[in-house]
Regions:
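Canonical tetratricopeptide repeat
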Residues: 92, 126, 159-160, 193, ...
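N-terminal leader/linker segments that initiate helical-solenoid repeat arrays
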Residues: 37-92, 99-100, 108
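Structural marker of alpha-solenoid helical repeat scaffolds
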Residues: 82, 115-117, 147-150, 182-183, ...
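Helix-start (N-cap) detector for alpha-helical repeat units in TPR-like alpha-solenoids
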Residues: 87-88, 120-122, 153-155, 187-189, ...
Length: 299
């Protein structure tokens, strides 16, 4: 499918697989409970048997999904140094670095996985995602091009859409965003990104429709609510949309609408919206107060 899409359009994201954590946690709980009991030789033997049930794979899985990310990085870095031939440990290190937000480190770790000659298409996709987060566009494009076209996943198409956006290849971007949205059960995030792409191009109506679609999938996605207000404000509609919101969110969205109005020269409307935001917030809302003061109006 990808190859066909590229031909039609012209030339030119991460979670670990679910693991059996419940059994691991049960074994840990059993060991802890036994150690708390009055101990004798028999109890120690049972405790050792319980702990021996924790294989290296169990520990790695626990680190990947339940452990503190920094602790997981230390674990996999130490393990990979001890057993450099094991690509699974380098993969665990790369994924753990992603969890800490160290995208530079993650990209380097994924480089090592790819250099091992045993990287999967999913590994290469993770590497491309790390490069996209670092805005290393040319390297990200090369990384995606190295993935077989038969590897058609949500994350692959999401990254293709982002790179098409960067290149301002709007038709390709739209095609990739649409495909990505169809490959996930939780499309709100990619619909929101697609909407922001439309907004940046000046297609305010198209952006508004996509933000509304994102909210129909995930009604509490605040980023989509805020972007929807921006899209409406771009065509001078400053009324808040009929979406579910808390009082705090209402204040924040009124503040966004106010700034959109002021940016377009509708200063009086913007000032009124700032006062509404200040009144809506259950506590003192400093961003609105500061904006009012900047306009030379009393708070």
């Amino acid at each position: 499918m990808l190859a066909r899409r590229r031909g039609a359009a012209g030339a030119d994201g991460q979670e670990a697989k679910p693991m059996r954590i419940a059994s691991t946690m049960a074994a840990l709980g059993c060991a802890i409970a036994l150690s708390a009991c009055a101990g004798g030789p028999g109890h120690q033997g049972v405790e050792r048997a319980s702990l021996s049930a924790l294989t290296d794979g169990d520990i790695d899985a626990l680190m990947m999904t339940s452990g503190d990310p920094e602790t997981a990085v230390a674990h996999f870095a130490r393990s990979a140094e001890a057993e450099p031939a094991r690509v699974d440990l380098r993969r665990g290190l790369a994924l753990s670095l992603e969890r800490t937000g160290d995208h530079e480190g993650a990209a380097g770790a994924w480089d090592e996985v790819v250099a091992s000659g045993r990287a999967t298409a999913e590994d290469r996709t993770h590497r491309a995602a790390a490069l996209v987060r670092l805005s290393r566009w040319a390297e990200a494009r090369a990384a995606l091009d190295a993935i077989p076209p038969t590897h058609e996943t949500y994350e692959r198409y999401r990254l293709e859409a982002i790179l098409a956006d960067v290149d301002e290849q709007w038709d390709r971007a739209d095609s990739f965003y649409e495909t990505a949205a169809g490959l996930t059960d939780t499309p709100a995030g990619v619909l929101n990104n697609w909407g922001y792409s439309k907004l940046s191009r000046g297609d305010h109506a198209g952006a508004e429709r996509l933000f509304a679609r994102a909210l129909s999938e995930e009604p509490d996605l605040f980023t989509a609510k805020n972007n929807l207000v921006l899209a409406r404000g771009a065509r001078r509609d400053y009324a808040l949309p009929a979406v579910r919101m808390t009082q705090v969110e209402r204040a924040q969205l009124l503040h966004t609408a106010a700034l959109a109005a002021i940016k377009q020269g509708d200063v009086a409307i913007g000032r009124g919206l700032l006062y509404d935001a200040l009144a809506s917030h259950p506590q003192h809302f400093e961003p609105a107060a500061s904006a009012i003061a900047a306009l030379g109006a009393p708070v």
